[in-house]
Amino acid sequence: MLPTIITDIECLVTRPDRHNLVTVVVHTNKGVTGYGCATFQQRPLAVKAMVDEYLKPLLVGRDANHIEDLWHMMMVNAYWRNGPVINNAVAGVDMALWDIKGKLADMPLYHLFGGKSRDAIAAYSHAASDTLDGLYQEVERLYAQGYRHIRCQLGFYGGNPDALHSTRQPTEGAYYDQDQYMANTLAMFRALREKYGDRFHILHDVHERLFPNQAVQFAKAVETYRPYFIEDILPPAQNEWLAQIRSQSAVPLATGELFNNPAEWQNLVINRQVDFIRCHVSQIGGITPALKLGVFCQNFGVRLAWHCPPDMTPIGAAVNIHLNIHLHNAAIQEFVAYPENTRKVFPQAVEPENGYLYPIERPGIGVGIDLDAARQFPVVYRPHEWTQSRLPDGTIHTP
C-alpha cells in the first residue's frame, strides 16, 4: 500500500454558541483531509498549543496509514503522558487519521471497524428545571420527540438549594447542600414515578457531589425508583468505595467521563463494580483506545454509554455513533440538541430520529467542519463558575 503522507495539521478553536470547541484537521499528499474532535473546553488553547507546537512537527512527513504506531508515538513522545491536554490533542489527530482511512477505503467508520451490531443506538437527553412543574414540561417535550430514556435533574448539579445555611461572608462560588440535594432528588424520583409510571427510563447524574457515606445512603434510597443508571455517584479518586455501594444496592452505576487511562477503569471493570463505562472518547485518547476499551468491557459484562455533552463537537458525537453501531456491548448514547450556530459550523451534524441515532453512511466519520463559518466565531474565555462548587461552610468540592 502506498503511503499517505501527512503534509499539514491545523488546530481550530471556535465558539459558535456557548462552548469553545476544538477541531483538528489533518491534510495529506493524496488530497484527503481528516477531522477530529479535541475539545477540552475549560483549557482549549492548551490543547491547541499541544497540537500546533508539538504534534504537528512530530507528525508531518509521516505515513497516516499507521494509526496504531502513530498513536503510541504521540502518547509517549513527551515521556510524561495522560491527562486532558495531551489526551485530547492526541485524540483529535487519532480521529482525523481514522477519518482519512475511512475516506480512502470509501467506507463509514463502523464498516471499517467490522460492521454493525445493531440497527441504531437508543439516545437519551437532558431534562432539567428548578421546579417539578418545569421538569415535567421538559420531560414531556423530550418524550414527544421520541426519547424513552431521559436524564432528569431538579436544579443544576447538586440540586436547587433552598434557604442555604451559609457563613456570614461566603467565598465566591456555586453553593449547594448535600443533604438538601439528596432529599430533593429522591422526591423528584418519587414524583416522576407517580406521574409517569414506567413510560420512560429515568437517568440521573450525581456529578460527584456526595461524600462516600452519603453516596451509599443515596444508592440504597434511590434503588426503589428503578433508575436506568446513576451517573458519577463518586469522584474518580474515591471509586474504591464503589465496592461498598455495590454490596448494599442493586442500583445500576455508571462512571468514567473523567478517566484518562486504563489504570482508572481496569479494576472497576474486572471486579464488575460498575454497570456502564461512560468514558469521554477524546479524554482517553481517541478511537484507537476506545475500541480496545469496548472489547475489554464486553469480556466482563460491562456496557458502554459514551459521554457526549454539549461541550464537544458534532465530529466527536459522530465518532460515538460509529462506536455504538459497531461495538456489541454499547447500551445507550447521551445526546443534547445542537444550537443554530453549531449546526452552521458543522453542517453534517447528526440528530436523533424518534429517540434513536442511526448509522452514518458517509465515508470516514461523515461529519466535517465549515472552516470559514468556524472562523466567524473565535475563542472566548469562560471562567466556568460552576466548577467552583462549594459546600455551605465554604469548602470547595469536586464539581
UniProtKB/Swiss-Prot annotation:
It comes from the Bacteria. InterPro entries: D-mannonate_dehydratase-like (IPR034589), DgoD-like (IPR034593), Enolase-like_C_sf (IPR036849), Enolase-like_N (IPR029017), Enolase_C-like (IPR029065), Mandel_Rmase/mucon_lact_enz_CS (IPR018110), Mandelate_racemase_C (IPR013342), Mandelate_racemase_N_dom (IPR013341). GO terms for molecular function: magnesium ion binding. Mg(2+) binds at residues 205, 231, 257. One of its GO terms (biological process) is amino acid catabolic process. Has no detectable activity with D-mannonate and with a panel of 70 other acid sugars (in vitro), in spite of the conservation of the residues that are expected to be important for catalytic activity and cofactor binding. May have evolved a divergent function. Signal peptide: none annotated. D-arabinonate binds at residues 207, 257, 278, 307, 334. Keywords: Magnesium, Metal-binding. PROSITE patterns: MR_MLE_1. Belongs to the mandelate racemase/muconate lactonizing enzyme family. GalD subfamily. Gene3D superfamilies: Enolase-like C-terminal domain (3.20.20.120), Enolase-like, N-terminal domain (3.30.390.10). This is D-galactonate dehydratase family member Pecwa_4254.
